[in-house]
């Protein structure tokens, strides 16, 4: 990721992506600024109903620039989506580390501590989606249907990594759990949480972002804790 894209991601971890609105008095954006504007505009367009597939012509028209201008900054539309995916990955992965305290969660914890930690990770991903609706279409692959298959694979790997994080959160130190099958329990719990997480994101997208993914979240997670 370039320094400009890294800054773009860092600035927007806690805020939704919004449509670019360059100052009318500036005729030429600063170096790297146009790339950010393109990604912001693409994300904003993905928030609109029925916006699963966006053409470069529509994106260029939205920004009042030519398609050739888009391709001066990105070699292909797939590369634009890769920019959004990098934002998703950097944002969510870094926040997950903040929750767990390390890249690999510490198993030296009680069962309830592990469950609480896993629930915070689930809540974080759902909150990220709620704040960045356009990104949800990318996360679920809806916006990537006609794009290079590697983009779909990358998002699949994203969710696999989140499930691995949940599984690691739910694993506890030997002797800390009275269950005879603690590893199996962790695998089952992480699978259930992951299904819930993806289901909430899908409902959010299918409702054109009316049904919030965090709706009654605490109550739902509490029921799954038993």
Regions flagged by a language model, labelled:
Residues 1-22, 127, 131, 164-172, ...:
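C-terminal peripheral helix-coil segments that are non-catalytic and often amphipathic
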Residues 27-34:
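Short, Lys/Arg-enriched anionic-surface-contact patches
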Residues 31, 81, 85, 89, ...:
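Amphipathic, non-transmembrane alpha-helical scaffold segments
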Residues 37, 41, 45-79, 83:
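Helix-turn-helix
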Residues 55, 137-139, 179, 205, ...:
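Short, hydrophobic secondary-structure boundary micro-motifs
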Residues 83, 97-131, 186-193:
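Hydrophobic alpha-helical connector segments
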Residues 93-97, 149-176, 184-191, 214-222:
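Amphipathic alpha-helical packing segments from all-alpha helical-bundle domains
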Residues 129-150, 202:
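Amphipathic alpha-helical segments used for helix-helix packing
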